[in-house]
Amino acid sequence: MDNSKIKVVVGISGGVDSSVAALLLKQQGYDVVGIFMKNWDETDDDGVCTAEEDYKDAVAVANEIGIDYYSINFEKEYYDRVFTYFLDEYKKGRTPNPDIMCNKEIKFKAFLDFAMKLGADYVATGHYARIERGDDGVKLLRGLDNNKDQTYFLSQLTQEQIKNVMFPVGELQKKEVREIAKKYNLATADKKDSTGICFIGERNFNEFLSHYLPAKQGNIVDVDGNIMGKHNGLMYHTIGQRRGLGIGGDGAAWFVCGKNLATNELIVCQGEDNPLLYSNKLYASQFETSLNHLDRNEFDCTAKFRYRQKDIKAHVKFIDDTHVEVTYDDTKAVTPGQAAVFYDGEVCIGSAIIDEVYNGDKKLMV
């Protein structure tokens, strides 16, 4: 098949995954163009702008592969659509996942729109996921590398957003991606994977957050209201957290099991098997699916409530088009603001953002 007339615009980040994605597409004969997205104006603790370093690596790879490349600045879109959302969620005492919103609003909206204006037939990224095309549209499938599968972060995408997408490394193991990069002497072959939230990088999370949200010290209390210590800000803590509480004493360890925004209290309970840490029902909003056909009344599935969590059997019941009730086996530390992501075997059905968490009919203090 002659792919030379098919234009694929690849998001090249300066990392090994997108580098190999671009290489594979070039080898398959596509007309490949690389685009580097600058989403955040950042400097690390040593005064080095990591985006500049990434751009240099992206340019080096584009030249090695022999593809044209451009740089596009999405800082304003990112700030307005992702970072503002991130801060708003923390203000509400929730724990958001900005990577999901970045994919939904930037990589597969702003970038996708830009690529299509360039005349792209497809866009591609270095995500570990797969696309299956059939008579009933396009389906989003888990990446074959179970440890690297990134469908959790792609779960808010719609059919419209994924129908012209390719994930060239989704069929590969991470080890194979590194081997390909080394075989072809790509500049990013030995570059370590980026970790953490893109706009924070390797920096201290609490310190970063304090620049944008005023931290307010308050009491750490047990479930009976007894004061156990002090916290430096509710936003620095998440459900199920054990470390950094500064509570000693005898007996089992203490865990965060709730937040009271009205009184600025962090609520803790004792013991890692404490029932207050476990839930079996949640309510979620902003439901999205990439499937063309889905039972909008209810369906059985498996679910993940955080990245790399094992699949849990679940039942999803629609309240309306965007709100769902999800029931599941007892699960620890299910957290408002995170995504509940739904699967049917290898197929990622979609996701919704967790609002309220229950154990039976009892609403947990989160």
UniProtKB/Swiss-Prot annotation:
UniProt: ATP binding residues: 11-18, 37, 126
CC annotations in GO: cytoplasm
Recorded catalytic activity of this chain's protein: S-sulfanyl-L-cysteinyl-[protein] + uridine(34) in tRNA + AH2 + ATP = 2-thiouridine(34) in tRNA + L-cysteinyl-[protein] + A + AMP + diphosphate + H(+)
Top-tier EC class: transferase
A Pfam family reported for this protein in Swiss-Prot or TrEMBL: tRNA_Me_trans
Region (Interaction with tRNA): 148-150, 306-307
UniProt entry keywords in alphabetical sequence: ATP-binding, Cytoplasm, Disulfide bond, Nucleotide-binding, RNA-binding, Transferase, tRNA processing, tRNA-binding
Protein's name according to its UniProt entry: tRNA-specific 2-thiouridylase MnmA
